[in-house]
């Protein structure tokens, strides 16, 4: 095997943007930021919460529908 070809595998802190929870894991990255973690995820907490990404999907679908309609009219 070749020596010194593997990335450094160190302990990093993972930060949750939603609830502010932090925990330590190991990774090749310097730091990790997640949108939602097991501390605030609805599946693990049993509480229903709104996730911001749903609005982004709806916005994308609206834009795509407009462009598809304009392409259909052009033909």
Swiss-Prot record:
Q: Which branch of life, at top level?
A: Bacteria
Give the protein's function: Binds the 23S rRNA.
Which BP terms does GO give this entry?
translation
Q: Does the keyword Cell division apply?
A: no
Q: GO molecular-function annotation terms?
A: rRNA binding; structural constituent of ribosome
Provide one Gene Ontology cellular component.
ribosome
Q: Name one Pfam family in it.
A: Ribosomal_L31
Enumerate the PROSITE patterns for this protein. Answer: RIBOSOMAL_L31
Q: Which organism is it from?
A: Chlorobium phaeovibrioides (strain DSM 265 / 1930) (Prosthecochloris vibrioformis (strain DSM 265))
- Indicate whether Cell wall biogenesis/degradation appears among the record's keywords: no
Q: Which InterPro entries match?
A: Ribosomal_bL28/bL31-like_sf (IPR034704), Ribosomal_bL31 (IPR002150), Ribosomal_bL31_A (IPR027491), Ribosomal_bL31_sf (IPR042105)
Q: How does it assemble?
A: Part of the 50S ribosomal subunit.
Q: Which UniProt keywords apply?
A: Ribonucleoprotein, Ribosomal protein, RNA-binding, rRNA-binding
Instruction: Give the family this protein belongs to, as stated in its UniProt record.
Output: Belongs to the bacterial ribosomal protein bL31 family. Type A subfamily.
Protein name as it appears in the record: Large ribosomal subunit protein bL31
* HAMAP family in the cross-refs: Ribosomal_bL31_1
TM spans, by residue? none
Q: Which gene encodes it?
A: rpmE
Signal peptide residue numbers: none
